[in-house]
Swiss-Prot record:
Keywords: Ribonucleoprotein, Ribosomal protein, RNA-binding, rRNA-binding. The gene is rplV. GO terms for biological process: translation. The globular domain of the protein is located near the polypeptide exit tunnel on the outside of the subunit, while an extended beta-hairpin is found that lines the wall of the exit tunnel in the center of the 70S ribosome. Residues 1-225 are annotated as: Large ribosomal subunit protein uL22. This is Large ribosomal subunit protein uL22. PANTHER family: CHLOROPLAST 50S RIBOSOMAL PROTEIN L22-RELATED, LARGE RIBOSOMAL SUBUNIT PROTEIN UL22M. Coiled coil: none annotated. Residues 137-175, 199-281 are annotated as: Disordered. Residues 139-153 have a biased composition (Basic residues). One of its GO terms (cellular component) is cytosolic large ribosomal subunit. Belongs to the universal ribosomal protein uL22 family.
């Protein structure tokens, strides 16, 4: 974005405003609005560069309208005795209005006709010079946000830094006063200073015996745990061996097979009886 401070000449008089309008353009309003929305609010020189490299076909037409608006603004500034460049102007407004629609038709089969709508549009672009307020706002925006944020943090951090420097200085003074009082009390009463090393020494001498007893107790407990584990491993196979063998019950024969066999035996008996009766006869 081109800054207004780097322009060729800055206006000291009133703000210069100019516009350019293209009427009855054969570009549809929807396609023209896609291009116009991209340059609205941009500086005039940046808007021209953007329109130069846009892939849309409407960008060439909008470029011509913007160039005409810039030329109109330069003429207005010349009347006031000022000089303006594209860097000194900004696209303040840009919009597209819908023009009349030309209705045509396309003949189709069996006497039918399809309607054709040829839409037109009116493209309008307004430009104006940078006012003094806009220049100050632009210079503020030119400063990166990180620098302003760092300045704000450093300004707010000064009281905290002073407090941090004061507190460490106060703590050592209090500590030194307490040590002086303790030393004075120790010099006044000698017995407390003599008794504390003895107590510490007795505690130091007692600790090895206690640690030895604890280690012995721990070793005995580990030995007991090992013996119990061995006993459990030995008793487990014996218990498995003592278990009696489980006999599975024999599978019962199905009732259907038994019935079939009974029927067959009855049939054999009836045949034998019939043969016996025939022999006797």
């Amino acid at each position: 974005m081109a800054s207004p401070m780097g322009s060729t000449a800055s206006l000291t008089g009133p703000v210069v405003r100019a516009r350019a309008r293209l009427r009855y353009s054969t570009i549809t309003p929807m396609k023209a609005r896609r291009v116009v929305d991209l340059v609205r609010g941009l500086p005039a020189d940046e808007a021209l560069t953007t329109l130069q490299f846009l892939p849309q076909a409407a960008s060439a037409t909008v470029y011509k309208v913007l160039a005409s608006a810039i030329a109109n603004a330069q003429q207005e500034a010349a009347k006031q005795g000022e000089r303006l460049d594209a860097e000194d102007l900004v696209v303040s407004a840009a919009y597209v209005d819908e023009g009349p629609t030309l209705k045509r038709f396309r003949p189709r089969a069996q006497g039918r006709a399809y309607r054709i709508r040829k839409r037109t549009s009116h493209i309008t672009i307004h430009v104006e010079s940078w006012p003094a307020e806009a220049e100050t706002r632009a210079t503020k925006k030119a400063v990166p946000k990180g620098a302003r944020h760092r300045r704000r943090l450093t300004g707010a951090g000064k009281p905290a830094a002073s407090a941090a420097t004061e507190t460490p200085a106060a703590q050592p003074v209090a500590a030194t006063t307490e040590t002086v009082e303790v030393e004075a009390a120790a010099t006044a009463g000698a017995p407390p200073t003599v008794e504390t090393p003895v107590a510490v020494a007795s505690a130091a001498t007692e600790t090895p015996a206690a640690t030895a007893a604890e280690t012995k107790a721990g070793g005995a407990a580990e030995a007991e745990v090992a013996t119990t584990d061995e006993q459990t491993t030995e008793t487990a196979p014996a218990a498995e061996a003592e278990k009696p063998a489980v006999r599975r019950p024999a599978a019962r024969k199905s009732t259907t097979s038994a019935r079939r066999r009974a029927a067959e035996t009855e049939g054999h008996d009836s045949d034998a009886e019939s043969t016996d009766e025939g022999g006797t006869r």
